[in-house]
Amino acid sequence: MDRSFFTLLGSGLLGISALGFVWSSPGSPAQPGRPDGDWRLLEPVSYENLTMFPVVSSSGYDTSAFLTLEEGLSRGEVTVREQGAETMIRNRGNERPNPQSYSGPSVNQLVLTNHSKRPLLLLAGELVSGGKQDRIIAKDRIVAPFGDPLPLDVFCVEHGRWSAGSSFNEAKTIVHPSVRENAAINQKQADVWAAVTGGSNVANRAAMPSAAPPKVSAAEISETVTVEAQTQSYTKIYESRRVGSSVDTVVAEIQRRFRRETSGLKGERVVGVVVAYGGEVAWSDIFASSELFDAYWSKLLRSYAVEAVARPSLREKASADDAREFLRRLNGREQTESEPGVYRWREISEDGLSQIELDALQPKLMTLHRLVVRRTS
């Protein structure tokens, strides 16, 4: 669990042979997707140190052709298993799959099969429970329909167990932003686990004059994860009375205010949110359709709330101008990966911000998910 991303890269963590990998220079033209001007921010919804700006759009894509991980696992159309003796992967030409032999289960790689007739959407930070350890998806991607078993990059969020079955279930959980950032951007197992046990990447920042201590300290979260059990698991954060009750309160208040703010929309639908903690705009998740946003909303809201209770409480509130500036298209170095005919993933980094976009290439070119992160490490 303590191997670095670069060590794992050498041993095949990113082992999908169909992936292409390129670097683009700063200022390269934007790829097709939803125009930046097609979004509008509503008035912010706030509770304590958490503020959300609903993102609405008057147009949206038809995303009914895509399957979510929760749907796929619950219906038996998707299987996730520990890595076994042999895995089949497609080559770049999408020809007959080639066998690859493995010695056995791996902490940072599982095997996923999409049996469905629909392409499968995966988001970084989605948690799958079971197997020998609970894991989270390492990176946004799309898995083609009727596929063969593929290696799936993951990070461990459970320590102290390496036993039990080989199959996984969907935990209906997306880990909170500090953990998602370390998975999707830093891509280091040690950083992921540090965020699991420490709560927030910013919890230990030097205190600002207006900052109050977090509602739940890093020590309390660490104790919650480790206490009274043989294993240390991320899911205990959600299940514990100490952390869970604080999170439940934030979720209930934000949900009530969010519904009130977004009710009565005419000709527009909510497709995402911009998230701020105190006066700092920190995160945004925006989708190609309101249906996709709705599919992930409850899990995302809970993840934002976990981050909120783990961060210092600040009196300042982010402004709408701050949120709009956060959504501007970045102009920095661009890293791109693609699987021909299936998806394109790209990350642009500029001045402490990272923007990640996942484009579907079939059945129609569209940006399914757009993530913007203010990096904390």
Where in the sequence are the language-model features?
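Secretory N-termini
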Residues: 14-18
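Intrinsically disordered, low-complexity segments enriched in small/polar residues
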Residues: 19-120, 125-377
